[in-house]
């Protein structure tokens, strides 16, 4: 049986929001079966809960943001990616501000936090969204697509006219499993170009950004002293983002995802298109006495 998972213990972290620059206190708490991932704005009176739901996405400019009952939750994609990577289904995320902490710009610190809290299996089968028919969305030359596949596979291609992002380093594929996610994807950081800084500042974006939490490029090179963590860190981060954005569908995906120059907006459009086409997907689980799911999650981590 492939079971649902939650945290063993409550764990806390502090950081700054990438776009707001605000200090934020975050608490991750265990949640019961079928609870799902729910964000909780504890700085509001009364407290407002915001489910991790693709239908609640209202912000896709340089991050993925949710709105529910007037409360915003910004930049959810890196934590959502880590939760998907470790197979965590049920968790409460308490925040003292509207934006999650950016940490180091990857999902690595969130993976560490979740593993430090401990991950436990729960007494109910995990629910997967199995892709039955292809679903594709486009925006200009950008494409995002789901296809049936026995497992979970992601492929992504980026195109940037920059010497540090040549064509041979613009493509990445991953056969999803916890070990592949942690090793190959989780440490890839978000990135930005100096030329876009003015645009971002005018819109009050990137106010918490620095070389401590992003890869920064000028016209020719990477400005971070420690360089890159992977030679193709840029496209790997796009897969990290996609895994987080797609987890807002409400369950783990069984299928193949392909992105060409896609981003948060198109990823969300793809999930909405999928959920709206009831013939294109189905809920499946692997209860006791049946085969294991085709996606491999690491053994639970008992902190």
Swiss-Prot record:
Alphabetically ordered keywords of this record: Hydrolase, Lipid A biosynthesis, Lipid biosynthesis, Lipid metabolism, Metal-binding, Zinc
Entry annotated with the keyword RNA-binding: no
Cofactor(s) needed: Zn(2+)
Residues bound to Zn(2+): 78, 237, 241
Keyword Transcription attributed: no
InterPro entries the record matches: Ribosomal_Su5_D2-typ_SF, UDP-acyl_GlcNac_deAcase, UDP-acyl_GlcNac_deAcase_C, UDP-acyl_N-AcGlcN_deAcase_N
Top class in the EC scheme: hydrolase
Gene Ontology cellular component annotations, sorted alphabetically: membrane
Gene Ontology terms: biological process: lipid A biosynthetic process
Reactions it catalyzes: a UDP-3-O-[(3R)-3-hydroxyacyl]-N-acetyl-alpha-D-glucosamine + H2O = a UDP-3-O-[(3R)-3-hydroxyacyl]-alpha-D-glucosamine + acetate
Single GO term (MF): metal ion binding
Catalytic residues of the enzyme: 264
One protein family per Pfam: LpxC
Pathway note: Glycolipid biosynthesis; lipid IV(A) biosynthesis; lipid IV(A) from (3R)-3-hydroxytetradecanoyl-[acyl-carrier-protein] and UDP-N-acetyl-alpha-D-glucosamine: step 2/6
Annotated EC: 3.5.1.108
PANTHER family hit by this protein: UDP-3-O-ACYL-N-ACETYLGLUCOSAMINE DEACETYLASE 1, MITOCHONDRIAL-RELATED
Function: Catalyzes the hydrolysis of UDP-3-O-myristoyl-N-acetylglucosamine to form UDP-3-O-myristoylglucosamine and acetate, the committed step in lipid A biosynthesis.
Family affiliation: Belongs to the LpxC family.
Name of the protein in its database record: UDP-3-O-acyl-N-acetylglucosamine deacetylase
Gene, per the UniProt record: lpxC
């Amino acid at each position: 049986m492939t079971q649902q998972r939650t945290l063993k213990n409550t764990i806390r972290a502090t950081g700054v929001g990438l776009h707001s620059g605000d200090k934020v206190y975050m608490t991750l708490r265990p949640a019961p079966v079928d609870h799902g991932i729910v964000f909780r704005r504890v700085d509001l009176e009364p407290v407002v809960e915001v489910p991790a739901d693709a239908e609640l996405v209202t912000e896709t400019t340089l991050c993925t943001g949710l709105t529910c009952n007037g409360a915003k939750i910004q930049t959810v994609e890196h934590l959502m990616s880590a939760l998907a990577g470790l197979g965590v289904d049920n968790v409460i995320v308490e925040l003292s501000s509207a934006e999650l902490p950016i940490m180091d710009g990857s999902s690595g610190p969130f993976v560490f936090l979740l593993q430090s809290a401990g991950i436990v299996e729960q007494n109910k089968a995990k629910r997967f969204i199995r892709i039955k028919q292809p679903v594709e969305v486009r925006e200009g030359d950008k494409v995002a697509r789901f296809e049936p596949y026995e497992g979970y596979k992601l492929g992504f291609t980026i195109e940037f006219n920059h010497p540090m992002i040549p064509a041979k380093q613009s493509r990445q594929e991953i056969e999803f499993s916890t070990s592949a996610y942690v090793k190959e994807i989780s440490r890839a950081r978000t990135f930005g170009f100096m030329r876009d800084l003015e645009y971002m500042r005018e819109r009050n974006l990137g106010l918490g950004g620095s070389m401590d939490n992003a890869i920064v490029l000028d016209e020719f090179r990477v400005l971070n002293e420690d360089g890159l963590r992977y030679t193709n860190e840029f496209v790997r981060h796009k897969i990290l983002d996609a895994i987080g954005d797609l987890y807002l569908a409400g369950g783990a995906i069984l299928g193949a995802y392909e992105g060409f120059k896609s981003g948060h907006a198109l990823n969300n459009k793809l999930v909405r298109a999928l959920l709206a086409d009831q013939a294109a997907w189905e809920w499946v689980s692997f209860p006791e006495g049946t085969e294991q799911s085709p996606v491999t999650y690491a053994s639970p981590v008992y902190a």
